[in-house]
Structures are given as structure tokens and as C-alpha cells.
Amino acid sequence: NLTWRTAASYMWQQVREDYWDNGSTRQADANQSPYGYGYRNNDEKYSWQVTNTLNYAFSLDDHAHDFNVLLGQETWYTESMNLDNEYHKFTDGNFGLNDVSMGEPYTWKSGKSREGLVSVFGRLSYNYKERYLFTGTLRADGSSKFAKGNQWGIFPSASAAWRISEEAFLEDVDFLDNLKLRIGYGTAGNNNIDNNMYATSYGSGHYGINGSDYITYVPGTTLGNSNLKWEKTTTTNVGLDVSVLGSRVNLSVDFYNNESSNLLIKNKIPTSTGYSDQYQNIGAIRNRGVELVLNTTNVRTKDFTWNTDFNIAFNRSKVLELYGNEETNYFIQDYESRMGYKIEVGKPLGQFYGLVYDGIYTTDDFTQLSDGTYKLKDGVPSLKGFDRSHVKPGDAKYVPQTGEVDENGNPVWSTNDRTVIGNAAPKFTGGMNNTFRYKGFDLSVFMNFSFGNDVFNMSTQRFIGPYLSNQNSLAIMNNRFTLIDPSTGKETMDLVRLAELNPGQYGNDIMWNISENNKTAISDHSSYYIEDGSYLRFSTITLGYTFPKNWIQNLKLSNARVYCTLNNIATITGYSGYDPEVSAESGALTPGIDNSSYPRSKSWVIGVNLTF
């Protein structure tokens, strides 16, 4: 009844990268290298893990009371080293990096990072006649990501279940096969932050004197915080399992409440500190919801069966607290300065925060002047601080929210007019799988879905306009407002002529013109880039055939099956990007980002299962 088990693993990898630009490239020219520029990087990493568990099981009173005790220990360690060297000003480019003495060192960088995690844990399980079940666990984790005094976290949990259908008062209920009530409470820790964030690090930088480069120490962008500690999530769960009609209908319902405190967040700090951000334990959030799983046998005959598996989940998040922010009850988390997220006490996570896009200025927003020019009509909003005489038809326009006006009483908008413009959290998600079997044939069709979630289409924002060097534009810019009269090849100021050139200016799909006025439109935090990400995906279809036993018995086979599987067959969605099921490069505070996410591939698999 006593079992001791040990598991161990080791990983080592090395990556070497050599890069060379001869003197004819722009990169070499930018690095003052008429005969070439290059760098050589060497990265090495190894990690190991050892887990030991001791398990003891015993019973009392002829298995009426079953006990199981487990004790365990786990150690994980990783270390990485890197050496990066850049060379420029080569006097001869024929040898490349084979002779770096031909050039001058530009940057020499090296680094070493270590990370370790030590865990001890225990579990006690008790089972009384498969009717009453109890489990308690205790886990302690020590992480090198925190400073001494904060490295260890203690995380207990417990669960209980009551199989009500085993009670005497239900033994005469023939249609009921299983009725089980479950309840659980537990805690878990999270240390998912960059390494060494409890200390302030420094890097190397350049400064020039008399045409020569000198290397010096410079502070990093992140200020260390020795007070960092484990993020903690407390989970409460109540569930019910029901099986009826000879287990042809099985239902599981779970209600859960997860509260996370001491959230580890990289927070913006005043630039007067000399740094831009710092990891802090600054908040608490709650996720609450219900999950439902339904399994049914819809048809069951001698030759044909049809089973359905269906699941659906409803989750609602809420920000409970924000520490260290007494002035306001919210803060704005920017993602690469391209979209804002409003994290606000009492509100859900995933709130996109930006300006409300109001289409473009049409010719109706202007008055033709006697000198052939035009001006913006009074009462038409414009950007605060921007000369209204420079506004043109086809410029992007936004909705003022604050009621602010300029000195002439005209409404204006600014960054103060940003508001909540969407939410990345779906109202519900789920999936359904139908399996059909007829004699030796089987067919399985799986679909999954999400409804009510918004997506920040960063791909559109990046490539919508030709404002960056060597950048093409998306095809939607073919339907842009034009200021150029093709008969003259010049910009026209005639409003009547502009209306003739842009008959679709009142449509929802008209794009702004590509004048300098709209250069900021590719970086504005705007509702234009927020789209409905709801979808229904036909994810997998599998068709198989199992050969009759009498066909294969002479081949010394006990079972033989051939099958074909199609993956990612089709997706029904209104999203304009490749895939609405995205969250590229995003975290809990910045979800729902499509940053040129690689599209899911369609694939097929043909296989054979043989059992000897």
C-alpha cells in the first residue's frame, strides 16, 4: 500500500545566430559601415526538474472507510546565458564575420538569468462507501522571483462530495442513476512575472564624444520592487451531477466564484522617478459564473446510436479593488500605445477605452467661400487645438463626450473624450459534439462558439494607411475619400466637385483621405478598430470505419479502424480579420487583441488504428 515515485527531466539548448549585411545595404549604412555590419549572438539555456511523491493507501472496516495519503516535493531550476556582439566600420567586407578584427566592436552585451521554484505538498483523501468523499490539500511554493521574506506562499484547499443517490430514501427512484453534490474551496498562487523584478537592473548605452562611441551604464525602464509577493486566487465551487434514464441523460452544473488578490501588474509610474513602470501588487478581481455540461444518448438501437455532448459557460468578471490609487478608482492600461483598457473598480475586465469614431467629414459639413476655398460650418466638432481652417472633407471625425467647446462655442474632442468602446469578454462560450454510429461507421462533428466578445483589430490599425516607410495599405483604402481631381491631378477645393468624386461619402464603409491630417488615425485609440468577435466554428469532423471481426481475424488483429479527420472546416463570423478567436500577445488586463495573428490552418488527417 506504500508507493514511492520519482520523476526527473533535463533540457539543454543552444542557439547561435550570425547576421551579416554587406556595405550595399541600408542597415550597414545606418551603422556607419561602408564595408559591412554584423552581429553574432549565442544563447544557451538548461533546466531540470525533480519530483518525489510518497503515497499510502489503506482501508478500515472491510473497505467501508478508504484513506489515501500523499506527500510530495518538487524542485525546478532553469538558467540561461547570452552573449551578443555587434561589429561595424569594417575596413573590408570580404571576410564577413569570419574575421571580426576587420571591424570595430559596436556593442558587447552578456547576460545571465536564473530562476528556481521549490514546492512541498500533501493530500489526504477519505471515502466512506463511495457515498461521502472528502479531500484536503496543502501546498507551499517558494519562488526566486520574489525577494527574501516574500518568496514563500502557502495554499490550502479542501473539497467534499455527497453521492445522494446512494442514500436509502432514494433507492426506489428507478429513473435516477446518479445524484452527486460537490463543494470545493481552495487557493492557488501565481508568480507569472518577469525574472528579478524585485531588483532594479541596469543596461548598457552609447554616448559619443568627438566622433567616437563610448559605452556606459544606463538604468532600465522598470524600477525594482522588493515588496512583491505571490498573487493569490481563492476559488469556491458548488456543483451537481445528475444521471437519469439508464445514464442516457447526464448533466453537470457548476457554480464558481474566483477571487484574485495582490494582482501582479506592471504599472506606470511618474517619469520623475527616472523609470517608466514597476511591477506592483495593486488590485483584486473576481470571476464568477456557471458552467453546464450535458451528455445525451438521443437514439440507441441495435445498429445505430446518436450521442450529443454539449457545454456552455457564462463568466462575469469584476474589479474589486485597486491598491495604491487613492485619487481615482481606475487606471488606464495601454497596449503598445495603440489601444487603451480601462480597469475600474466595480466594472468588468477587458474594457476597451478610446474615442468613438463618427465617420468622416462630408462635404455637407463645410461652406463654400467666394474665394473658392471652404470652411468648417459652425457647430461641427473638431479636434481641440487644431486649426479648424485646416480640416478637410474626408478627414476622420470623433464624437465629443465631455461637452467641451472652443472659444467660438464649437464642440471639440480630445483624449479627455475617450470612453468605454467595447469589451473583450464574451457573454457566453461553449461547444457541441455529435457522434453517430451505424454498424461499423462512425461520424463525429464538433463545433465551438463564442458570443458577445469584441476584438481590437490591431492588424487593420497597423496597415490601414501608407504612413510608414515601405508599407502597403489594406484593400479597404480603395474606398477612401479622395481630394484629387483626376482631370487636373491636383487637390480641388470645390465642394460640388468633391461630392461628384466621392458619391459614397455617406456610406458606412467610406475611408478617410490619406492627407497628413489623418496620420494620427492609425494610432488613435478608436472604436473604428473594435469589431464584434462572435463566431461559430465547425472545428472538427471525423469519419471512420471499423472492420468486422471476421474480416481481420486471419490477420492476427483484434481490431482495425480507418478514419479521416478534417480540422478547421469553416467559421461563421462577422469579424473582418483572419480569425476572431484571438488574444495575441495579450494578458489578463489587455485581452482580445488581433496583432496580425497567424490564421488557423485547415488540415486533414487519414489514419489507421490497429490492435494486435
What residues fall within each predicted segment?
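Extracellular/periplasmic, surface-exposed regions of secreted and cell-surface proteins
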Residues: 1-21, 32-347, 520-612
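A conserved P-loop NTPase coupling/switch region
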Residues: 28-29
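Glycine-rich phosphate/pyrophosphate-binding loops
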Residues: 438-458
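Extra-cytoplasmic beta-strand recognition segments
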Residues: 430
